Every structure is written in C-alpha cells, then in structure tokens.
C-alpha cells in the first residue's frame, strides 16, 4: 500500500471519528462577548504583573497534549484560558487567539473522564512534558498564581502535562503534591469536574522573559531545602543542543 493511500485512509478515519464524537459531545462554540455565568474570572497582580484565575463550574478540559488545550464552560463556550499554539519556525510557537482553538473545528474527539471534586490545571503546552526549563517556568509558577487567591487544600486533583520524569514528581513533592493526586494529559485528554481552575501563563507565553517573582518563588521552594552535594559547575543537557565531546563530558 502506497504512502498516499495510507495518508488518505488515515484522513478518512479521522473524519469518521470526529463526526462520531459530534454525536456524543456537542462541539464547543466561541463566546464572543456573551456572558457566561458558569465561568468566573479573578484578576490579580504579582510584582506589577497582571494575571487571571479562571474558575469553571462543571467545566471540561480537552487537550492534544501539545499545541491545543481548550477550557470549556458548562455552557459549552471556549474560555480565554485556552491554549492554541502555532509554530512560526521549526522550534518556536506563539499562542494564538481563542478563535483559532482546534476544538472549534473538530470538537472534542476523546472519551471524557469525570472527576468528583476540584481540579487545578497546570497544562502549559507540549514543551512542558519533557523540557526541564519549561516545567519550572511554565508549570510550577502557575501554582503561585492560584495561591494568590485560593488554598491548595481545596484541590482534589492536579492536571499536569506529564510526570514521567523524576524531576517532575520530585518538584511537586516539595509542594505537598503526591502522585495519587495527579492526573496527566498523556493518559486523559478530555476531563470534566465539578470545579476546574486555570491561570494565565506566568510569563505570557514568552519563555525568554521569565518574571523575577517566578524565579524568587522557585528559589524559596527549592534552594533552601536542597541538601545535595555542592558542585563548582553544573551542566544542563538540552534536547536541542549538540556537543561534540558529550560522551567524554558525561564520564
């Protein structure tokens, strides 16, 4: 079977799945200035930076674990809390307008998992699944934003991009978050809960402009509790970085 035929069959299969899920879950719509009483928005300031906390009553989250995350209210509107990244080169992406969110085109073609209780979503795009820096600049600081208004004890489950790396679970443990309290988007891409909380991005989707409050927050949590051996120099291996004598360095 040729690659073209395989590609066409894959496209047909995807369209069938999308249309079947239209029958199960109504396709979300864009709010466009309509009032939505199932979504509350709290405005706050951290070190002169403006942020928002979004609270959804009986809301949903749909994500592809990469470029698209849609926060959907009980009234089936896509919230401004949503993420819709689009690449502008081979590596980097920009967050687009809510109107560009993929669920407005394809709906939510995954079975939904219901969670009894409250969820704090820390979803921050595909890079935060594996990238050490994105984890600490995009994911963890969202907890600080949430804590400006609410107590973490209110949260039943934390919705995270991944916990497959050791540093992810370790970093969460410093905040009292245990593995049993976590749901990952790798396993569940469509969830619903009695309450869902989300926040705006800690550095406004600009990883090169991490806010000073965010760095101080990380320092307060992790540095004072670090009992590891001190080193003169630390080498961080980045996935997009190539070093010719890396094997010798690791030895």
Q: What are the language-model segments listed below?
A:
Residues 2-251:
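The feature primarily captures lumenal catalytic ectodomains
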